[in-house]
């Protein structure tokens, strides 16, 4: 299944099936979080958090695609990602788009 960030596919005939979403809330464990706190003092990339967010985006995308497949979709257009802090050291990644079926 393809996902597109564009709002529509010019020249392609398709039927809109509806909005699909995927989300996850992730946090780091205490030991990893402590290590990242020390890294934050001296500066630089917080690799454990980068990896956590990459995993969260992947999982959210998989959940959105599963929802689209359940509708019989061929693709998802208008895909957008949103992140928000839920609490200290926890973040939500939400992905959403419009499921379509080619005619």
Predicted regions mapped to residue ranges:
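N-terminal presequence-like segments and the immediate start of the first folded domain
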Residues: 1-32, 91-103
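Surface-exposed short loop/turn segments
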Residues: 66, 70-103
């Amino acid at each position: 299944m393809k996902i597109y960030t564009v709002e529509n596919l010019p020249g392609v005939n398709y039927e809109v099936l509806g909005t699909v979403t995927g989300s996850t809330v992730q946090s780091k464990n205490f030991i990893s979080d402590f290590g990242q706190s020390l890294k934050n003092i001296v500066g630089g990339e917080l690799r454990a958090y980068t990896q956590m967010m990459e995993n969260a985006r992947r999982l959210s995308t998989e959940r959105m695609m599963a929802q689209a497949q359940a509708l019989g979709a061929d693709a998802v257009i208008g895909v957008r990602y949103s992140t928000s802090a839920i609490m200290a050291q926890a973040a939500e990644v939400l992905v959403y788009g419009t499921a379509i079926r080619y005619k």
